[in-house]
Amino acid sequence: MRRVYLDHNATSPLRPEARAAMLGAMDALGNPSSVHSEGRAAKAIVEKARGQISEAFGVGAHDIVFTASATEASALALKDRGFHAGDIEHDAVAAWVEPDLPLNAGQVCVTEPAQTALQLANSETGIVQTLPASLGFCDMTQGFGKLPLAFSWSGADIACASAHKLGGPKGVGCLMLKPGVEVAAQVLGGGQEMGRRAGTENVIGIAGFGAAAAASARDLSDGKWAIIEKIRNILEKTLEASGKHLILDG
């Protein structure tokens, strides 16, 4: 029997474009912080990926902070900042917020947008939240590459994303900042990522992230996810017509 992998919200298969970009980056010898030619070559790979993510996610290139995961990005944005949320958030966000916001028909009731953390889409139920006009933090990990979305018009001050949710490698994510919004670095000891996150960048992983982001944006514009939505609807209707007692969640 042929197995079909359906757990893409947990992690998605590596895209061929990401694999090719990562293989190419493996030959980059230098440290992207070094000023010699090898270092500049590695830096160019990082900045190419930053540009790809900037275009795919609708965020300024200088407002992207590369991290090791969306979990780290969430901590960088939320730790000790007194944010509130509903009780539906991923553990990476729930660890840093007060989960005291009520829900109404699956939607979080936002009362103080500037101090609210809100996920765009739930990894288990698939429920998509209606984002308010302004928002302190948005976990966009499950939305990028699947929903028509740009950080620039989302209304969020800060958002996070992860490479392996859209066909990139595990172990790399990013934080996105609205122009003028800053975060206090938690990893110190270097000036990488414009002083926001110290440590030598994961050049290979970032290369894969950029390529995956570009490919996912093409899939979205080509209508791939509209087709998947139709298939999902057919599946739901078929299950409902089976006569079995079903509860569709999401």
Task: List where the protein language model places each region.
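Pyridoxal 5′-phosphate
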Residues: 1-250
